[in-house]
Amino acid sequence: MDELAAVTEIAAPDVGANQHRWLIAIAVMLGTGREMVDTSIVNVALPHMQGSFSASVDEITWVVTSYLVANGIMIPLTGWISARFGRKRYFLFSVTTFVIASACCGAAQSLDQMVIFRLLQGFAGAAMLPSSQAIMMETFPPEEQQLAMATWSMGLMVAPVLGPTLGGWITDNWSWRWNFYINVPIGILAILMVYTFLEDPDYLRPKRGAKVDYLGIGMLVMGLGLLQLVCDRGQRAVQIWLVERRHSQS
């Protein structure tokens, strides 16, 4: 019986020992909330961005498409990357990269620059959603996990709803560029809080030397990227093909 208890204790993660758990919750929700807001905040600013970059309606939609494609590629890889490099380290890297990419998006001088920086922003932001959920479950004891996850879920549901309203207000009163600059101070606060209070659980450390399936990762990235691209832009391609076919038959 004692041996079984010992094995169970080793196998199960040490959950709920962190006395700063609500500060950690605020930190991860700051990062994740900004990522969720950014999925919708730029939609209302697209006409203003279109004028700044002298882009067509079809071209400016790549600002949204690039972000969604990068998100779709990176989300499935988050668990493996967290296990290999550490959840705290990866989350800090993601938030830091997201902040830098946001500042670059705000300073972009062409559509090409904006699309590249939005790709970088999407790659970085993708890690925050699954990582923050895992961090919440590992930080809170079992008796508080339901409350913690309810709070986390509420924040994630509110963030995309606030995005268009906040984006419209910022664009009208300041500039569309501030839809990205606003991420910088919030992101820096999240970085400082995560660095100060968050620690990796012990059960993740033995997994950092695992073998890497580079072929599998490459196929996953290619497949998910193309699938996301088809889902987002496929209808447009079909419409163009139908128009060209109609002209060729007439």
Task: Give a label for each model feature.
Residues D2-F197:
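Transmembrane-helix bundle of Major Facilitator Superfamily
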Residues D172-S250:
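Hydrophobic transmembrane-helix bundles of small-molecule transporters
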